[in-house]
């Protein structure tokens, strides 16, 4: 299932992203920034973005939430 809104993304969600070659990778949601919403430290992002972390600790930034699939 794909996300319909950035508000549906939860911290700790396990998601699958697909790269340009069709290879699917499983990630964990680390941070979800929503455009126009201020976080606890006073940061307000200008666009939506989600920061993911894989099993090896590598971080990936996704700007289009519809590219991520939720693992049930």
What are these regions (language model features)?
Residues 41-43:
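Short histidine-centered beta-strand/loop micro-motifs
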Residues 1-14:
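Mixed-charge, Lys/Arg-rich low-complexity intrinsically disordered regions
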């Amino acid at each position: 299932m794909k996300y319909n809104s950035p508000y549906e993304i939860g911290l700790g969600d396990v998601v699958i992203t697909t790269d340009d070659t069709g290879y699917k990778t499983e990630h964990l949601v680390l941070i979800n920034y929503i455009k126009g919403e201020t976080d606890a430290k006073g940061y307000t992002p200008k666009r939506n973005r989600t920061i993911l972390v894989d099993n090896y600790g590598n971080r990936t930034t996704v700007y289009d939430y519809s590219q991520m699939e939720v693992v049930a």
